[in-house]
């Protein structure tokens, strides 16, 4: 089954359909939510100094580096705040090193915390989708340090564009272990279809509203 579906991922017609759906939905969606984007930008500027957006390096299709766009959710001196926090709370270093996440992250602003819980901080990635660096649905974008955690699954990861949403997001998000996340990403890649994308997109909205596994 996995072999057959991997051939589908290489099928130009199927990939063209996926790309067309990405382009149409991201453009229409971006226009529809533009007023919301403006309000979020104003809230960020009013709460803390610094830019509204920030870019992060991630690994994209073919192993190439892409620069994903997000709303800024942290203070400007985030790295300094993090290192101080970990020094003062050494028991939390293991939690940080395991998944690069903290349940009570001191770097995150009040507006940023709300944006993360609702996943609204990732809306600017619609631009990455339009540009062709990401897909609406796909594996969670990873950084270089995560390659070793993916192991043999990394080869599968680089076959497709990373997504704004995916099986991980609709299956528990941060409540899942990293191993479970890799398994879900690999399952998606090996069982990809247009209908699976539609199902994940449909499930994304209630998951976001419910905020399950978000922090």
What is each residue range found by the language model?
Residues 95-161, 200-208:
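A short, structured surface patch at a secondary-structure boundary
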Residues 40, 54-55, 83, 137-139, ...:
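Short, hydrophobic secondary-structure boundary micro-motifs
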Residues 1-12:
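Juxtamembrane amphipathic/hinge helix adjacent to a transmembrane helix
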Residues 1, 54-106, 165-184:
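Short, glycine-rich, amphipathic interfacial segments at transmembrane boundaries or analogous
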Residues 31-34, 118-121, 137, 173, ...:
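Residue-level signal for short amphipathic helical patches enriched in basic/charged
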Residues 13-81, 128, 194, 199-215:
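A hydrophobic, helix-centered structural microdomain
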Residues 9, 180-195, 215:
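Compositionally biased, charge-rich terminal segments
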């Amino acid at each position: 089954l996995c072999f057959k579906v991997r051939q589908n991922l290489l099928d130009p017609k199927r990939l063209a359909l996926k790309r067309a759906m990405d382009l149409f939905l991201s453009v229409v969606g971006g226009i529809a939510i533009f007023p919301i984007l403006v309000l979020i930008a104003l809230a960020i500027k009013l709460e803390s100094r610094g830019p509204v957006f920030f870019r992060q390096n991630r690994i994209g299709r073919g192993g190439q580096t892409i620069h994903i766009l997000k709303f800024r959710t942290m203070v400007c001196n985030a790295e300094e705040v993090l290192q101080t926090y970990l020094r003062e709370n050494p028991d939390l270093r293991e939690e940080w090193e395991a998944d690069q996440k903290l349940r009570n992250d001191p770097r995150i602003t009040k507006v940023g915390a709300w944006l993360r819980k609702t996943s609204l901080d990732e809306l600017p990635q619609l631009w990455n989708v339009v540009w062709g660096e990401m897909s609406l649905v796909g594996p969670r974008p990873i950084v270089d340090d995560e390659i070793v955690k993916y192991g043999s699954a990394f080869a599968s990861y680089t076959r497709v564009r990373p997504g704004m949403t995916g099986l991980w997001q609709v299956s528990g998000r941060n409540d899942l272990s990293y191993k479970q996340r890799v398994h879900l990403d690999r399952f998606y890649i090996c069982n990809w279809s247009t209908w699976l994308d539609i199902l994940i997109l449909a499930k994304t909205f209630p998951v976001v509203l419910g905020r399950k596994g978000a922090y």
